[in-house]
């Protein structure tokens, strides 16, 4: 599992700790970096000023800094994290699903939490392309990849900020990339469909 960054935000200390413990129980392989926030305004500031980057937010709705407003503000950012609302209130569920990836009710049911986290990991995995490059493991966001081209036994990956040359074949790369996003117009190329302008 790739290393993902998670923020848990709840103004009630005991409930914040319960959510963090649920994440830790799920994360048996240590694939998550978890940060706690008791104030949604501080979390929003960290995200807007790019002091922090998160892949997932677990947000309470009823806080001094409303969780709905926070999530709606985040959707305006170019790259925003997935959101799971974790709240005591059932009545916000319909509105919550319009903004969030999932909506869970406190106290957390572990099987529902596990199912939600499985869906998160699957979604995040589909957005990352993990490769070995110069002795290190890199996790590239698939949205930053323009196209891949074959050069003998290597693949040149053209990305938003850099080009990388890796020892792999196009079919091997295609196995790891989300098939709904990448097409092969020729056996030597894979093109990210998100970057095609019609």
Could you say what each language-model-derived stretch is?
Residues 3-23, 57:
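Conserved acidic segment of CheY-like receiver
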Residues 13, 38-42:
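Acidic phosphotransfer microenvironment of two-component signaling modules
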Residues 25, 29-31, 42-126:
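CheY-like receiver
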Residues 34-36, 103, 182:
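Conserved beta-strand scaffold positions in the cores of enzyme catalytic domains, especially
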Residues 35, 60-63, 159-162:
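Short, flexible loop segments at the rims of nucleotide/cofactor-binding pockets, characterized by
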Residues 38, 105-106, 168:
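Short loop/edge segments at beta-strand edges and connector loops
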Residues 115-198:
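Conserved binding/recognition cores within well-folded domains
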């Amino acid at each position: 599992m790739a290393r993902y960054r998670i923020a848990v935000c709840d103004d009630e200390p005991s409930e914040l700790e319960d959510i963090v413990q649920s994440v830790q129980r799920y994360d048996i392989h240590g694939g998550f970096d978890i940060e706690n926030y008791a104030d949604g305004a501080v979390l929003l500031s960290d995200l807007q000023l790019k002091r922090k980057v998160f892949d997932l937010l677990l947000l309470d709705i009823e806080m001094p800094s409303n969780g709905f407003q926070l999530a709606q503000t985040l959707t305006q950012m170019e790259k925003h994290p997935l959101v799971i609302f974790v709240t005591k209130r059932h009545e916000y569920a319909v509105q919550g699903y319009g903004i969030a990836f999932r909506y869970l009710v406190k106290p957390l049911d572990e099987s529902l939490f596990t199912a939600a986290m499985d869906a998160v990991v699957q979604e995040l995995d589909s957005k990352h392309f993990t490769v070995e490059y110069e002795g290190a493991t890199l996790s590239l966001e698939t949205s930053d990849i323009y196209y891949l081209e074959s050069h003998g036994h290597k693949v040149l990956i053209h990305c938003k900020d850099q080009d990388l040359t890796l020892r792999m074949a196009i079919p091997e790369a295609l196995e790891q990339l989300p098939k709904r996003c990448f097409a092969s117009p020729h056996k030597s190329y894979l093109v990210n469909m998100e970057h095609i302008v019609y």
